[in-house]
Amino acid sequence: MSNYVERCIELCKQKNPGELEFHQTVEEVLSSLTPVIEQQPEYEEAALLERLTEPERGVTFRVVWVDDAGKVQVNKGYRYQFNSAIGPYKGGLRFAPNVYPGIIKFLGFEQIFKNSLTGLPIGGGKGGSDFDPNGKSDAEVMRFCQAVMTELYRHIGPNTDVPAGDLGVGGREIGYLFGQYKRIVDKYEGVLTGKGIPFGGLLGRSEATGFGIVWYAEEMLKANGEDMKDKVVGISGFLSLIHI
């Protein structure tokens, strides 16, 4: 590992204390880039790695909503817009009780590279809230999503940042978010992906990631002169990829 990479990893840990998930992914990614960095000294001069590991913008906001019992609830919301070098920020929204800046930064940082590999002009970002949708009624989820979008709408747009779903955020939640966005800005535009078919969504969207994993695995095996026949597949964490 180059001295420059080591310094950047340590700097990231110092600037983001206690965010272990973010530390881990930064260390893994930057370590893998060492051969490239050593061959391109101009990257260090341009502080490329420092810029990659620092979000272009980070927003933390309060989400106030009312539950079915009429009690006011308060959650935290986040949106980290990591990198827009090749296009608008793109990345999901996660609703889970363990969501905090470290997880959102970890996911947003990885999203830069995942999106660039598609060949599409999209940057990387991620967002979410510590809201737990489990056990909540449809009406509670709707009110929460509306409260999120009431703050989030000012930070997103079809040419700025296009969120999607993630853990705890499926077609229902995207629909509630999109409805509130339209209500506020009075425009029907491509600001969220993962919508239902009646609201401009795409057929096969929910299955796309799962199929993509299989096709990607097939291509990796093919590149090494192998195929899927008789292979044993281990699945560790599938979130919303599996539909029964």
Segments from the language model and where they lie:
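N-terminal ligand-binding/catalytic initiation module
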Residues: 1-203, 207, 216, 220-223
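Short helix-loop-beta connector
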Residues: 226-230
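Hydrophobic Val/Ile/Leu positions in short beta-strands of Rossmann-like dinucleotide-binding domains
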Residues: 233-235
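Glycine-rich Rossmann-fold phosphate-binding loop(s) that bind the pyrophosphate
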Residues: 238
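Conserved small/polar residues in nucleotide/adenosyl-binding loops
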Residues: 242-244
